[in-house]
Amino acid sequence: IKSSAASDVYKRQAQAVSEPAQETQAEPAQEAPALPAGDIEAYLVPLEGDEARPEGAGAILEKNYPQGSGEKYIPCGSGSIKNNTSVSNADVAAEITNPFPFAVEWNSPDPQILIMHTHATEDYRLSAGLWYRPGDGSRTTDRDLNMCAVGRVMADTLNAAGLNTLHDETLNDYPSYTGSYANSRAVVQQYLAQYPSIKVVLDVHRDAIETESGSRYAPVCTVDGRQAAQVMIICGCDNGTTVRLPGWRQNLRFAAAWERSMEEMYPGFTRPVLFSYRFYNQDLTTGSLLIEIGGHGNNLNEALRAGQLAANGLVEALRG
């Protein structure tokens, strides 16, 4: 297994970019915006126009995924949770009303949040139009174009709001996809050992949804007149045998709070939380979640906007 220590040639030194905290600033400011909306423009990239469309380009299908209804779905504020476990809906509904499992320190010199990427090389399309290049595998080692770019927006937004956040840019899935979760686990354990103040660990990915014919879906929504990718939180559950997550209830409370916050602030922004028998190294803290920012059908700018919106929602969730 490839070790993801600081000497890893594919790793950038993670840094907290917030200014040193004033000791008297113990509480967050109540006027909310974290990274002002206009500031996202500095992160956006030029997209290719239709004049660059190659022969045989694949099709993109935009879709807004609604909140779920039916026996598998549990209301969560304006959002919902899809229960793919044997835990009863009543138990889940009761659990998500319980108090937050941890408290972050605002404007602290000590890191509170870690953002990382098990599948860092996942990327997005770079076309403005609804097409993608033939043969595009939607992966790149260019950190300005892959999940690291989205993680930067999220980290900067959180730091600007007074939440000391570290962003690790290790390419845990390169050069080999096999073992990427073992690699990212070692990364997270290293951070937790060095910074025991960390309460939240976010593994930021993107989804991949496509038809049998190869058309790719782009989960989208409109916020303030601009298109952004939809997001989906994944929260694991302990099945007693192959998936051991003793703190799954605490993670679920956190997932529900973040889901409620995002969907209340930005209606239509979230897909239902997926509550399932997934491990994803979510045993390491009681604030460990995986979030999918759009999919391989979205363009990068939609994903960058979504990263800012998701982080804004997290700020409000952590304010309580």
Residue ranges and their predicted role:
Residues I1-A6, Y10-Q13:
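Single conserved hydrophobic/aromatic residue that forms the stacking wall/gate
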Residues K11-T118, D123-S127:
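Non-catalytic propeptide/linker segments at domain boundaries
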Residues P101-F102, G135-M147, T170-S180, V188-Q189, ...:
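Second-shell loop/turn segments in exported
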Residues A120-D123, L171-P175, R206-T211, D238-T241, ...:
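Solvent-exposed loop/turn segments at secondary-structure junctions
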Residues P134-G137, I209-G247:
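A short, glycine/acidic-enriched catalytic loop
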Residues T141-V220:
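Catalytic-core regions of hydrolytic enzymes
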Residues G247-L274:
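Active-site-adjacent substrate-binding region
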Residues G268-G320:
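Active-site-adjacent mobile loop/cap segments within catalytic or ligand-binding domains
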